[in-house]
């Protein structure tokens, strides 16, 4: 599984790189808090409606133990998306950094 660190993600966001940052939390959780610039995708099928095969895609959920971003990563890569990474630390890591 390809991953991205908080510092790498922050740098991409600061540079306004064209990434698709996908939050796999529930809609209620997403509405309460998410990383700025994220889109809500509660299933891989929903994600695929918003994504192109050439997009740089970063999936995340609540923390390192959250399985939904792992599942989204696996399904997207199996469907042929080539540039997918998982932000393992997720929202907990992002918030901890302030």
Each PLM stretch: what is its role?
Residues 30-36, 48-53:
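Short loop/helix-cap segments at secondary-structure boundaries that form the rim of catalytic
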Residues 34-38, 72-75:
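Short, glycine/charged-enriched secondary-structure capping and boundary segments
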Residues 13-19, 42-63:
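Mobile, glycine- and charge-enriched loop segments
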Residues 1-31:
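Flexible, polar/low-complexity N-terminal or interdomain linker segments that lie immediately upstream
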Residues 26, 44, 90:
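A generic "binding-loop/recognition-motif" signal
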Residues 4, 40-42:
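Short acidic-hydrophobic, aromatic-tinged amphipathic segments that line or gate anion-handling sites
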Residues 51-95:
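Catalytic cysteine-centered active loop of the rhodanese-like fold, especially the PTP/DSP P-loop
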């Amino acid at each position: 599984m390809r991953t991205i660190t908080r510092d790498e993600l922050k740098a991409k966001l600061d540079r306004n790189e064209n990434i698709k940052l996908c939050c796999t939390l529930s809609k209620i959780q997403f509405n309460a808090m998410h990383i700025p610039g994220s889109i809500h995708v509660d299933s891989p099928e929903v994600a695929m409606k918003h994504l192109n095969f050439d997009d740089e895609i970063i999936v995340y959920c609540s923390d390192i133990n959250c399985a939904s971003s792992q599942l989204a990563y696996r399904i997207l890569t199996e469907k042929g998306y080539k540039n997918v990474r998982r932000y393992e630390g997720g929202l907990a890591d992002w918030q901890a950094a302030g």
